[in-house]
Amino acid sequence: VFAGFLLVEKFHFSVAEISLLFIVNSLISIPLAPRIGKLIAKIGERRALIIEYIGLAVIFVGYAITESALLAVLLYLLDHIFFSMAIALKTYFQKIADPADIASSAGVSFTINHIAAVFIPVLFGFIWLYSSAIVFFAGAMIALVSLALALNMPSKPNAGNEVLLGKFS
């Protein structure tokens, strides 16, 4: 959401230019998605999420400091490529969860995600009025917190081996 705002507000992209960017993004993302899935299967969820969160942190800092429209467009495209690696969360969950718990846990996760999807944009929208850079630096911080959590994932997760530190009996 905020990357699009940046392109419009700071770099004065038109509706046609944003629409073209959406099309280009789809033309890149759709054929790349199966390859990302294969990459996750090859390197594992932990490594995939580590790559994703490092990439997103760098991208968000890039959004915060860029003065180049071309760089902002490249960051936007990379943002979506890295974000597509989030499917690793779903495969990780499938490996550690009891199959009987997946539906109810997915429902709770979906609900929490949607609450955050309403709350965070409103909060960040108010912050945006003060400084768009702060919004992107905050996004980078969230990515770094997610990175810390990904680093706590085992390389070979399964039921009973969900995290490296902080296991509860």
Annotate each language-model stretch with its function.
Residues 1-18:
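Short amphipathic helix-loop junctions that connect adjacent transmembrane helices
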Residues 5, 119-135:
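Transmembrane alpha-helix termini and helix-breaking/packing motifs in multi-pass membrane transporters
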Residues 15-16, 99-109:
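Loop-to-transmembrane helix entry/capping segments in MFS-fold secondary transporters
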Residues 31-44, 128:
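Helix-to-loop junctions at the C-terminal end of transmembrane segments
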Residues 47-62, 140:
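Structural signature of the two symmetry-related core transmembrane helices
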Residues 70-84:
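Hydrophobic core of transmembrane alpha-helices in multi-pass small-molecule transporters
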Residues 84-97:
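Intracellular juxtamembrane helix-capping segments at the cytosolic ends
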Residues 137-169:
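Multi-pass alpha-helical transporter architecture, strongest
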